[in-house]
Amino acid sequence: MKKIFTFTLLFALLNICVSNKIFARESNPDENRSVELSFSINWTFGCYKETTFSNLSQDLLAPRFQLDTKIISGDFLHKITADYFFCRPKSAMTQTAVVYKNFDPITGETYYEGFKSNLSFHRIRLQYDLANDILKNDRFELYVGGNFACNAFLQFEHYPSITGLLSIGPTSAFNYKLNERNSFSVMCSLPLFGYGIRPPYAGCDAQLMKYAEESFMKILTLGSFLSLHNQQAVLLDFEYKLSASDHFSVGLGFDFEYARIAVPKEKPLYYVDGNFKTTATVKF
């Protein structure tokens, strides 16, 4: 509890300091402003362990699409990220038909039935980062701030199994200018506190779907509060950028993400993902 209280206090103080600087600073028409729009295609290698359904599922070289908007206004960095990832995990059940023994409760007889899994996995992330530069010169910039993220892990196998998360936490970014055309950046995000909705086992979304028909807002009552004791996650982003002109650049990068959501405690979800990305950026 002391660690959680310490993190809460530090995060609150950081937000207060950033907010005070926003409102205290006078408007200056000559301040530095820029907007960057980036689109990247990532090639993923990773896996996830959804223990409410299966032990381990993975897929290599699955595409991931990401759209970023980065706004630098004076001393502040605003970044909005939307990304989507889809795969059909490879396993024995998805590669070939499985024959299993079933029971007919009407006749009381057993019979054999063929089954082939159509398992698919989707991941959607929306994130907003706000950071203030604490160190800056002609070659490098260091930003520290916070982020708000919405994550959805969707798994479909004849019926949906959906995990939804809202979280806040600290974020930091480092930009280094190698020369006039080349630059390198690193960004790190950590969710500390949040709220998540996750079924206790696969196929137990009947109540969720019932609430969706009756009143969508009732779904929020099915969730749990998250912190370091039941959610651990980190997101790292490395990117090299080459400027072709003042308004266009291309880049290469690598992202790494780890997440563990222990709700329910006995059946956590693990998500480990690394991906190489190619990026095109337009700057205004």
Please name every model-derived segment:
Residues 24-93:
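Short glycine/proline- and aromatic-enriched beta-strand/turn motifs that initiate or cap beta-hairpins
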